[in-house]
């Protein structure tokens, strides 16, 4: 008998009840699950979303049954018990009751909810092929994505068209700087580069045609494949829009907004490299997805990884802000990790919420009390409104808003529509608090101001829990299976700096990092109990994945065998005597991965500084700067710390603009921002990321008052080569920042 979508979804929920072992839980818990499922199902069915839930669940369940690693959840989907029972998520809402289902689906919603899913980047195509097989290849496709010109590709295209010499193009390309805080389309801008670096300007003046590249920046260059979006149609997609094929992959000539407008069913399956790393880890250890999903979130040894600050390679926790907030919070349990995820963002950091959370948590101050109901909703976050769900609960329970009205506020928060959009509900909130909870207008007004301020940066707790769970898994791997963790992480690290950090961290954990071994290496990194981390053939410069696979087959394949000498590799097509010689030199080098280069450079520079008198001698290393404890004053403005002199290798330069920075955070106009500035003629400032032999990142900041004086000096720094000696003050903030007023450049050669 054919079941309706509603009947089938109920059946899958009953299967999920058994799969999750709900029947083995206490009666009170079972009653809670049953009531929640009935409530959610009523809303899902009434909105016509049952088919969508079934469709999504089917694809994810198939993937999990095939051993494809999927993340525990993403976004507000994790708040749904139905999603948990149908195996869309692995987060139990009963365990984390701060999550709100209404954040996922509310009564005012007419369009299907967003269900974003993370899966292994190496097997995402398997999910696509399953959908194509089940629904027909002509009905399945990838969403397109508009690609815009940025500094480097506009430079490359312009140089090619006007036959500009390669050396000129590379001179400018190597000087392109980041610009954060503004429109992402104009990050890594050529205009910034030409303004900042005299030698870049010289190239532009020598080859005037290159100025055309500036006109391309920000314009559409073409289309690519969206990183996550898949669509399924009930009719051939070519009946709806144009489709083009690239390498056998069908791509719509629509972006995600146009695809939704056309009525196509959209799935967001993001191929996440962390999930790919986990897939490799499971293969190396022989563990299964079930083992991964069963990791207890109260594992003390894993929590200790975070308490030690041992977060290199840990998903969502190794960034400079998260690293600093993790250190300040000093987590005691899993939910503290979710709080760190939410607090390590510009909004709460700049608003002082992160600092106040830490102060209250460690008993340095009392939480601000506005009303007992607000205290109840913020008890677990030390009196701070950190999450969107806390705001929604205040609106619902304290002000008596119905879910339709709460849903409208939810959209204002999630779409970041700004304070003006909040004000439409101000009077309703004031009246609602008085009529529902007997709260005076004065107190309600204070609560409202707190809501409006928090609403501009508050985070989704379901997403914070989901991604903290993924971070917890990676920390568990690092703690209990370190060899396999490092090998899998190195195999998936997508840039040289990430690989360097992982290798240095492995050495710090007494795990050796060895170059390729003729008869022991595979294509990429592999763990060895006796030797440590053995590099693969792909780690040798000039050896690509295809060549590495041929070497691997020759050594480990059915017809393969041990190599007698490096010269045996010459039997492989594409590998000649010179290549073999280079491979042998790399494999026998003293420091093939450059793990001691920074140490050698800094030792050489420090010896030079001790012998001369023109440049101040450093007083602190990066690690010593990080250990300086910074205090906050009552207004949460960071006070200036001690005077310091620091020396480190300049790695990257980030140029920023006050107008762009504030406008992106506050929504204020340029005129409004300029009125608040002292010296509105000074707008630019910059940050230089540095390392020394302690491998502690230090952010050298040049404020807008000092920038005009130091602009030329900053422009003369050769990144990834020069050592800079800076004089300034240690200041508080994420990372290890130093506000400087003097910069000296040392050429280590």
Residue ranges and their predicted role:
Residues 1-749:
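Noncatalytic, beta-rich nucleic-acid-contacting surfaces in large DNA/RNA-processing enzymes
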């Amino acid at each position: 008998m054919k079941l309706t979508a509603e009947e089938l979804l109920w059946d899958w929920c009953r299967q999920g009840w058994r799969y999750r072992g709900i029947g083995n839980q206490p009666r009170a818990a079972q009653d809670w699950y049953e009531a929640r499922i009935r409530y959610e199902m009523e809303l899902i069915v009434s909105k016509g979303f049952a088919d969508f839930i079934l469709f999504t669940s089917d694809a994810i369940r198939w993937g999990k049954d095939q051993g494809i690693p999927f993340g525990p959840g993403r976004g507000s989907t994790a708040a749904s018990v139905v999603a948990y029972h149908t195996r869309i998520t692995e987060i139990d809402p009963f365990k984390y009751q701060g999550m709100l289902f209404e954040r996922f689906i509310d009564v005012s919603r007419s369009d299907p909810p967003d269900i974003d899913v993370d899966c292994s980047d190496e097997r995402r195509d398997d999910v696509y092929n399953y959908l194509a097989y089940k629904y027909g290849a002509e009905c399945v496709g990838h969403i397109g994505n508009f690609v815009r010109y940025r500094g480097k590709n506009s430079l490359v295209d312009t140089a090619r068209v006007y036959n500009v010499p390669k050396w000129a193009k590379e001179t400018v390309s190597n000087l392109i700087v980041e610009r954060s805080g503004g429109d992402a389309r104009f990050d890594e801008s050529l205009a910034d580069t030409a303004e900042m670096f005299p030698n870049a300007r010289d190239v532009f003046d020598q080859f005037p045609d290159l100025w055309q590249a500036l006109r391309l920046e920000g314009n559409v260059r073409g289309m690519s494949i969206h990183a996550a979006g898949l669509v399924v149609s009930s009719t051939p997609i070519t009946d709806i829009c144009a489709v083009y094929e690239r390498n056998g992959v069908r791509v719509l000539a629509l972006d995600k907004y146009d695809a939704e407008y056309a009525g196509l069913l959209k799935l967001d399956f993001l191929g996440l490299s962390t999930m790919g790393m986990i897939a490799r880890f499971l293969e190396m250890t022989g563990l299964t997805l079930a083992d991964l999903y069963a990791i207890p979130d109260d594992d003390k040894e894993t929590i200790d990884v975070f308490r030690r600050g041992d977060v290199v390679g840990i998903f969502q926790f190794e960034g400079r802000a998260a690293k600093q907030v993790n250190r300040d919070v000093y987590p005691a349990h899993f939910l503290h990790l979710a709080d760190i995820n939410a607090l390590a963002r510009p909004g709460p950091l700049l608003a002082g919420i992160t600092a106040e959370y830490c102060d209250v948590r460690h008993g340095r101050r009392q939480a601000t009390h506005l009303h007992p109901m607000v205290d109840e909703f913020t008890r677990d976050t030390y009196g701070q409104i950190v999450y969107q769900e806390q705001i929604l609960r205040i609106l619902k329970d304290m002000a008596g808003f119905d879910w339709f009205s709460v849903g409208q506020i939810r959209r204002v928060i999630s779409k970041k529509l700004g304070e003006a959009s909040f004000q439409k509900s101000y009077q309703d909130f004031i009246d609602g608090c008085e009529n529902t909870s007997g709260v005076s207008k004065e107190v309600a007004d204070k609560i409202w101001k707190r809501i409006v301020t928090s609403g501009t940066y508050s985070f989704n707790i379901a997403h914070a829990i989901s991604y903290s769970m993924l971070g917890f898994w990676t920390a568990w791997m690092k703690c209990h299976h370190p060899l396999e963790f490092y090998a899998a992480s190195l195999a998936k690290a997508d840039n040289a700096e990430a690989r360097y950090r992982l290798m240095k961290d492995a050495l710090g954990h007494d795990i050796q990092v060895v170059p390729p071994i003729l008869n022991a290496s595979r294509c990429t990194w592999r763990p060895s109990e006796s030797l440590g981390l053995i590099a693969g053939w792909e780690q040798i410069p000039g050896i690509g994945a295809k060549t590495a696979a041929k070497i691997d087959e020759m050594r480990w394949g059915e017809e393969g065998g041990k190599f007698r000498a490096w010269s045996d590799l010459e039997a492989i097509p594409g590998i000649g005597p010179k290549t073999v010689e280079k491979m042998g030199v790399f494999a026998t080098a003293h420091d093939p991965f450059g793990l001691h280069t920074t140490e050698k450079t800094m030792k050489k520079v420090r010896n030079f500084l001790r012998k001369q008198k023109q440049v101040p001698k450093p007083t602190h290393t990066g690690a010593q700067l990080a250990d300086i404890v910074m205090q906050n004053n009552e207004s949460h403005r960071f006070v200036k710390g001690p005077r310091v002199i620091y020396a480190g290798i300049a790695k990257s330069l980030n140029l920023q603009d006050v107008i762009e920075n504030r406008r992106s955070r506050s929504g204020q106009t340029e005129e409004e921002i300029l009125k608040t500035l002292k010296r509105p003629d000074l707008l630019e400032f910059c940050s230089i990321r540095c390392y020394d032999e302690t491998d502690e990142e230090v952010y050298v900041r040049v404020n807008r008052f000092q920038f005009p004086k130091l602009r030329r000096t900053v422009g003369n720094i050769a990144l990834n080569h020069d050592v800079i000696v800076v004089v300034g003050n240690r200041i508080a903030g994420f990372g290890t920042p130093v506000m400087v007023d003097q910069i000296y450049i040392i050429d280590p050669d």
